[in-house]
Amino acid sequence: MAIFRDRTDKQVDHDRAIEDKRRHRQLVEKSIKENLGDILSEESIVGQSKNKKFKIPIKSIKEYQFVYGKNSKGVATGTGEEKRGDKIESGSKKAMGKGNKGAGNEEGDEVYETEITLDELMEYISDELNLPNLDEKKYSEIITDSCGKKKGYQRHGIRPRLAKKRTVMAKISRKQSKKRALIEEGKDYKTERFPFREEDLRYYKVKMQPKKASNAVMIFIMDASGSMDSTKKYLARSYFFVLSRFLKRKYNNIAFEFIYHTTVAKRVSEYEFFHKSESGGTYISSGIVEAINLIDEKYPPSEWNIYPVYASDGDNWSEDNIKAIESVKEICKISNMFGYAELLPSTYTQTMYYKFNKEINEKNFISVVIKEKKDLWEALKTMLKQELKED
């Protein structure tokens, strides 16, 4: 007689498919991280929709197999820091096609491309970073109404707020009142259909309460002078564009202001900021002073979390240097954070990055240097991960 044993309650110790999926996910995440700088600095990223796709190269995962050795002397030993899947080489290893001199005869690594959308890229950044804490202050213009708790009942209202249980109770109460009245009059009470009436309907009374949200404004300031060539401007726009997209995704109630300047600063629309170009001299102070005036007019520091961010190549008219330093000190006093990003700075002269860091000691002054495109990701991380502590 055959005996069947039930083993359904026992879990499989190892699922190869799950392990492969895990390794594949690790490779994808590693490739995204390694290529973030290139993706974020792409000129085409500016102004793209959330469904815009970017291609990322990923090395394939090979199946385990036995291979012939190179017949070299010695035994393969590790250092103790190896991870699962790492290769341990033994003896001397000759260059046979790994990018060294001459043509090689070894099989290369298989590489394929995967696509990631701009929206998915923002999601990845969200998982990696945390924004500065938006402190709760008094709330001014950005206040959203929300349906608060139910506060009692009323006889009139909209159908979605119909209180069914209370309506049935009102009907039963009316029915019982009629029954008592008939009995008191000495009349026979016969059970018959007793329909609902308008007077039975009860609706939830909902009190509208203001929903407090963290008021935050990001002020983007960009140097649009002649020394900012097309490469620097594209890099600055990519920097601001990713920053704005990430912040819009992270917070619902956040305002944006855009300022660009040469020797004179102008407040512009978001589209103009990311697409318009100018030329001329450079007064860094003009852009910062315009931001200070904007804060005085629209964003009281007692009610708003204020985050100005400035991007420039660091070249400034020498007569404006002192005024620029003083204006940065002033805007730091009324802001939660002031970020200064210097793009592809000149190696022949001392830029404003060094002057600012020498003269400005405010804790909420954050400065970064982007010497090449791959530095963009590190600059964004530094700016976004900075937590501010107010006195």
Curated annotation (Swiss-Prot):
InterPro entries: Spore_YhbH (IPR014230), UPF0229 (IPR006698), vWFA_dom_sf (IPR036465)
Family per similarity comment: Belongs to the UPF0229 family.
NCBIfam families the record matches: spore_yhbH
Pfam short name (any one): DUF444
Organism superkingdom: Bacteria
HAMAP family in UniProt: UPF0229 (MF_01232)
Stretches for region Disordered: 1-23, 75-107
Biased composition (Basic and acidic residues): 80-92
Name of the molecule in the record: UPF0229 protein CLH_2838
